[in-house]
Amino acid sequence: MELWVPFALFWVDLLTLEGLVMGYLDLARSRYSCREFEDRSVEQAVVDAIVEAGRIAPSACNKHPSRVMVLDTPELLEKAASCQPRFARDGSIFGAPLIFLICSVTDNAWVRPYDQMNSSTIDTSIVCDQMMMEAEEQGLGTCWVCHFKPELAREQFNLPEGVYPYHMLVCGYPAAHIADPEQREARTIPLSDFILK
């Protein structure tokens, strides 16, 4: 069966395009923690697309407690690096030109009644993951950083009362080297261990 769709002045054969479209699993497998970036800024349209991916992320009971701060100036990047000096490089974390600080208005988050678990950690993690995958789709490298001093981040970025920082998503165009997918697969637990029976 052949399926044709008019597109502008062209006729596009969708079956021909099938092999060109990356599926989600391919995208997820291509992602790796990037810690070296090119010395160039990320275009505003790309930043906007990544933020939008986070904005539409699901949350417990649709409470949407997550908030995102875009750190893309030398001053803001330096402040981010001060929250974890171990990762500081070239005035940023890993020298990245762009960092998203992902926070939660914790009082707005859903609380599980049986044990009072606040969903902020989960909700912000979903936001971070969706932003990370959109960044990958846009050709950026990313590194999800939780190892930073949250109280210092609150102070450095003058976060309002009740807003707590959970993650930093470090982004930029990756340096020439690319992580070996086979090596990454070797470090990932096998399916037989992943599934509980």
How does the language model describe each region?
Residues 46-51, 56-127:
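Glycine/small-residue-rich phosphate/adenosyl-binding loop
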Residues 104, 147, 173:
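Short secondary-structure boundary segments
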Residues 54, 100, 115-156:
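Small-aliphatic-rich amphipathic alpha-helix that forms the alpha element of a beta-alpha
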Residues 3:
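Cationic, low-complexity basic patches in intrinsically disordered or flexible, solvent-exposed regions
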Residues 67, 148-150, 167:
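Residue-level "edge-of-site" marker
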Residues 6-21:
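Short, Lys/Arg-enriched N-terminal segments with co-localized hydrophobic residues
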Residues 153-166:
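Short, electropositive alpha-helical surface patch
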Residues 24-34, 43-46, 167-197:
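C-terminal helix-cap and adjacent tail motif
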